[in-house]
């Protein structure tokens, strides 16, 4: 305590005329129009008129947004500046006020447009105007609100932030309720509703966070600090937290009708003392301990005030309080004596009258008593009188006065909420409790100071439940707590304290009074937070009503935030048996040590239909329609795997808060349906766990196919097929359905879902090829929300966004050769199976293929399933197709035997023996190509639809093709010249001058020597004394000669010359002349030497015999794959007319020779250069 207090001193932040009105820079806020007055009026409005419509919109205009100018907004800023002693910089201040002014002007236009539209709601121009005004208002608020959260000024700007946030939530609620009538589509309305629910949490958490930051900032050790701390707590509860506590009611789908909320939190006026705020050092903690701890709400019945006397001064020395539980549901109880029961005068009884005490006028007494000098001086801090005024909506009630009326008016700091009526009717708070700050320091001073607690008037006494509204009752209004339940401090956004349990058991009992007919039915909802899954039980007057399982909402050890709480409900309605009933809530089925917090319960009239109810009914109907009967034994045939996934999404999107039990039950049914779908699906790995994982099982595909996880279209994996630059190398995906899985004389169906596609070819192959080319428009046209759907909090797709409903009539079903319009993303193809033969294992091939550059596809949920047994015409048709197939199969076997024999003879002739490890000495490249061509004349080596799938003759084809490969390898080993065919450009060749390697139309690479000074050479290692054959295939254009020379360092030179000859030229070792070239070219299909005899006889079977899979009703013409002859290990195209092959024999004397290519003039074109070692 100060040694020399001066009671006449007015300290800078405090004035004795009102110890709680601070002054900053000489400014004072006009009484009746302060931020507290405005906030109390807004809170009253939100509590009483929280129904969407023009009345609400215009109400906000009348209270704030239509009457505020810069000075009023500045008052909000000044209020907190004073409390935290921090002034906002001029730029930030002007920016905030300018934005608020802009929002105010814009909202007035919005409100007027709303009023006009509501008067004529079908007027197209007014509907369009509302869409424009909403978009403008929403954009302005989205831009402005972050400017009220400027770094370092979050606390001073907090009250205007909350005002703007409240306005934003109200506008978003408007579009959620009226958006469809304004002409917005469902996607936009749902997106804005998602914004609404998200921002309710964001704005709430922001406000509470910075309220707590500011509160911590003003705490200090002395009584002066506590005064400011308490003022900050009280005033920002009124201007921030009370408004934030009502944000959750903006959720229009959860609260579609009038909703009554109650604020049970308490605020405190300072201990009524004169010269209190600056006189006591280190007293802040002691004063705060005088504040009542979290507790159940009770009703103040009476205060018995005792009087003591000191040196002739009477004062309030102590008091006794009696109270009743809410609803007056139990016996009156008394609190322990506060202070001491003085007997200097008879006790004064202040009894509850009317609606409670709404005002106190107190007379603090400070005296310094001089008893002598020095330590004999004594100070007295006491209260020597108070008038208690009672609230009434109708008449003035006589007040009760303890000793005398004072001048310290509680209405100065807790003003009425409605200044249009007398304070007794327009009051905002009533007295709820009184504690006593007592302190004595021997002969130095005596302190006795009552501390008044005040509760908002919305916390009514009787827990009344009417029939026409949603009634929210905080559980701190319970009559009794269950053993193990405690009351804990609320998180700041619940409007009061909350209950807590850490073990299973009864939470509390609540006395409620029903004003509606007892036939009225209700549903109960619970707002809770929990670290564990649990089960809630409810009962009325001991009669069990509801029981349900609910999930954890938060992790252990985390702070309570807006997102920690969830409002859950029971779907089963009930009615009360008595007008006054006891409602009991319990929590069970969880492990002790977890935390369960309960904020409030809600009683909802049963006839109120929520969107969650519609969703539940729709989901129940969708789930039941999956099955053939109510016992869920089998799936309906037309229910696709994709549809089951969409029904699963429908179930997953059900509200946990409203119907968790039903949701879990439906989820189990959908999982059962999915398992049934998997069981009937004959495809292996329909969920695309991998491609090419197993050689003989599952999916096989080209390397450019990608598997992607689920998105907003697909719940499971799907595949993406891209286009290709070469139709002979398509993008493909295929799988074979084993014969063992098929039933004889049965129709099967391939179906699935295509998100989008272009040039996607789909095949089903057995006796014939069922084929469709499918072009499906992308998701932007038939699935409009695919690209617009918002994502979840972890980046997952939001499958709860609205989309087009599944309609089986829109399926793209291609049956019996009918063409498909492809207006749907669903597709299906049928194929009929005749007799089955496990030895033959014909099976069914399922193929997806894209062979164009612009082609693409995304598809999933593929199914191959039994459709129905074949009867009548369909049975006859498949038997006819099967017979035709077998007839052609027999013909193919006869033809194949002949072709195979001839091809094998051609291949065998290339080799010395049956080990196929050495070529004949005279085998040349043309002979190998001729044999390879004969091998490729074997039909049905691969499926014409996809040349990577083996056909009936694959085994014999690959046997002979393997030997051709061996022949090419042995031949390459004999040629000592590297890159002699120029397939690798000029690699290994030395070049002088300008030459080119070009790819001609026949896809062969050739060396072009266009200038006489150019030269191409290569050094080659050889074996001295061995014989070699130099063979060159080339073509000469224009005059002059082309020359290929072989030589050693000295002498031993030979050459082959080529010219565009006009007369026969004979070279010493060359066996071909210009005149006989044409004959040889015609005989062998290319330019070969005279040693190529015997390899061009016509085959014994016509080359164009029809495919054995042909079935006229499905495929017209011959199933021939134009890319079939491109298969194998070498592509061979006969040389154009004009090329000549010449050769010579050469015997080197050293281990190195040089091959040189040049010309004299014109152009010399070289196809290949070979230097072959002769056989010994």
From Swiss-Prot:
Q: Which SUPFAM superfamilies match?
A: delta-Endotoxin (insectocide), middle domain, delta-Endotoxin (insectocide), N-terminal domain, Galactose-binding domain-like
Is Transmembrane helix there in the keyword field?
A: no
Read off the InterPro entries from this record. Answer: Cry1Ac-like_dom-VII, Cry_V, Galactose-bd-like_sf, Pest_crys, Pest_crys_Cry1Aa_dom-IV, Pest_crys_dom-III, Pest_crys_dom_I, Pest_crys_N_sf
UniProt keywords (A-Z) are: Sporulation, Toxin, Virulence
The highest taxon in the source lineage is Bacteria
GO BP annotation list: sporulation resulting in formation of a cellular spore; symbiont-mediated killing of host cell
The entry assigns this protein to a family as follows: Belongs to the delta endotoxin family.
Kindly provide the name given to this protein in its UniProt entry: Pesticidal crystal protein Cry1Aa
Native organism taxonomy: Bacteria, Bacillati, Bacillota, Bacilli, Bacillales
